[in-house]
């Protein structure tokens, strides 16, 4: 199963959602293998597990540029050289700042979008769940990820700017459904404070619009909290994988969202 996390707006907890859905899958599907492929040049997936993406020896860009394994080597860096085990049953394939230039590199024919697609396909042969964290735009890496996905998760902050951007993303996704009619989409509110009228109103408005466009809308949301960043900062893990103590409420939110994603794909309720 390929799950992409997409929004062309930054700051909506996209990477946080990707890493915590992965952590929830560890709990829900312990026997199945999961991997997160980081397609965002900020490298925040690595940072979520206590890794500095700029200090890693091998990353996604090395595979794409066919960097030799060592000086004078006839063979280039492969997927196995880049995978990092970060938790039992969960690996990451990291990237770094160089991936920010993907569109320029592709235009200069250093590699092709189909090379990225091939890496994803190779991962699906080895893992039950392949999660794709994408950059905050709608450029080549994002369109490639969406074209390969079984489900696209769109986290969004319920502010006054949400509606227009979200509907444009949904319209873009509709073009991929022509080739992949089974593609599912789900909108998930993040940074939610239900004590504010604005958040309540925007959520209801987006939900209504989503249903009219045959797009799933999560029954659960991610509450506004600083605990997720604290978990990464102190424990070098997403909040879904740290000790429950004071984090149980937020762990439950991600767990329920993950169940909805699985149900959407397995039973087609959209």
Curated annotation (Swiss-Prot):
Assigned protein family: Belongs to the ParA family.
Superkingdom of origin:
Bacteria
PANTHER family, from UniProt?
P-LOOP CONTAINING NUCLEOSIDE TRIPHOSPHATE HYDROLASE (PTHR13696), PARA FAMILY PROTEIN CT_582 (PTHR13696:SF52)
Transmembrane stretches in the record are: none
InterPro entries annotated for this entry? AAA_dom, DNA_Partitioning_ATPase, P-loop_NTPase
Q: Which organism is it from?
A: Mycoplasma pneumoniae (strain ATCC 29342 / M129 / Subtype 1)
Output this protein's name.
ParA family protein MPN_688
